[in-house]
């Protein structure tokens, strides 16, 4: 985003805004980052870009990242642990591999 440093945020694209939001959050060196639907509305390649940024942040800073997300590819590719909710109730709390095989998760997300 350094090439956009003199530009108003109104002129930024959606992916640039998401990157700016992450940069602003990280500027205060938090111990915890909550990513709430950061990837909503992004294209597949933009989701990949955000995932790379989050993975890089996690590896370099060892920050804990809580991801609230509906893009399962992103959740499963990023997370060490996944907690799935259905109607506000926890239906799974396990590794991505275990969660993806959980019948309650399949029912909640794909229907019967």
Which residues make up each language-model segment?
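Glycine-rich phosphate-binding loops of nucleotide-dependent enzymes
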Residues: 1-112
């Amino acid at each position: 985003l350094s090439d956009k440093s003199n530009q108003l945020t109104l002129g930024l694209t959606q992916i640039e805004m998401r990157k700016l939001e992450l940069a602003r959050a990280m500027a205060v060196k938090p111990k915890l980052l909550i990513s709430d639907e950061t990837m909503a509305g992004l294209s597949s390649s933009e989701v990949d870009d955000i995932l790379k940024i989050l993975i890089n942040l996690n590896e370099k800073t060892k920050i804990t990242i809580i991801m609230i997300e509906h893009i399962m590819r992103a959740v499963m590719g990023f997370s060490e642990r996944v907690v799935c909710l259905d109607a506000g109730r926890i239906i799974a709390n396990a590794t991505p591999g275990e969660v993806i095989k959980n019948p309650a998760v399949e029912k909640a997300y794909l229907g019967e």
